[in-house]
Amino acid sequence: MSQQYLLKLLYCQGYIAKDNKIKMIINKFLSLLNRYKTDLPTFTIVGVGPGDPSLLTIAAVDAIKKAKVIVFPISDDNKKSFAAEIVKKYTKFKKNIPIIFPMARKDFDPDEIWSNAVEKIVKFIQNGESVVLLCLGDTSLFASSSNILRLIKNNHAEIITKTIPGISSISAAAALNDFDLVKKGETLIIKECPSSESELTTLIRESKANKTVLAIMKVGKRWNLVRDILKKEDIIDTSLIALSVGMPDQIIQYASQYKKEFMPYFSLILIRFD
């Protein structure tokens, strides 16, 4: 039986995917085939690191080279993809498919965006083409790609999925400044920057009392609020900021040294209470 015929039989225009038991059987069967290194098309989420192409893992490069289709997020029609820029050396002769993730828009409907993305991806796979979805940083930290993976697993159990982790901006920033993210017996909290003064103040004070290490992500437009609280809590001289890690405009310095009134979207703060 040829691979093309097998694929058509398994997908069967979506009819067989309606039965959960059949979904499970197909998924196990395809996983077994994949274990024996068949060339069935796959969907792979690839973490590409924070911005520096030299931080790409070997596994990430291998997956990109093998895929026929490279899907990557953009914020709107006129903007480039940071993730696509990182891997452009390996994607010149691929099908490069941008998908709009307008996260900053107030009318953003995540369910519609994820569903449309899944529909595009599934069509390529049903045509026998392996797809890689690029993910900036690591695939497990604030990654929109996890929503797409969830939908594919729930609605297209016959598709073989893989996830390749990448270096996060947190670990990259820590390494660039010899910053210990967490030592034996310590706790690390990774959290998106709170929008209110009271929430951020509580987070910092509780972390200080428990000597918990803080990694505050996506500071961006909230920098003025954050700066004022860092001053009030007398930790502005020891709080490490990292902006656009791995990118040409990278900045890593202590918060007291940063004089601008705003921060870019890709911004984080690392705080220890030694």
Tell what function each PLM region has.
Residues 77-80, 104, 168-171, 189, ...:
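Short gly/pro/ser/thr-enriched loop/turn and capping motifs at secondary-structure boundaries
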Residues 116-124, 179-192, 258-268:
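A polyampholytic, Gly/Pro-enriched intrinsically disordered region
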Residues 81-83, 107-109, 172-173, 193-194, ...:
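Short, charged, surface-exposed secondary-structure boundary motifs
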Residues 2, 6-14, 22-53, 58-60, ...:
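Class I S-adenosyl-L-methionine
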Residues 34-39, 62-63, 125, 133, ...:
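Solvent-exposed alpha-helices and their adjacent loops that cap or buttress functional pockets
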Residues 141-206:
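Class I SAM-dependent methyltransferase SAM-binding "motif I" and its flanking Rossmann-like core
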Residues 43, 205-274:
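A contiguous loop/helix-start segment that scaffolds small-molecule binding in enzyme catalytic cores
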Residues 109-119, 176-179, 201-207, 252-258:
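Short, surface-exposed amphipathic charged segments that create phosphate/polyanion-binding patches used
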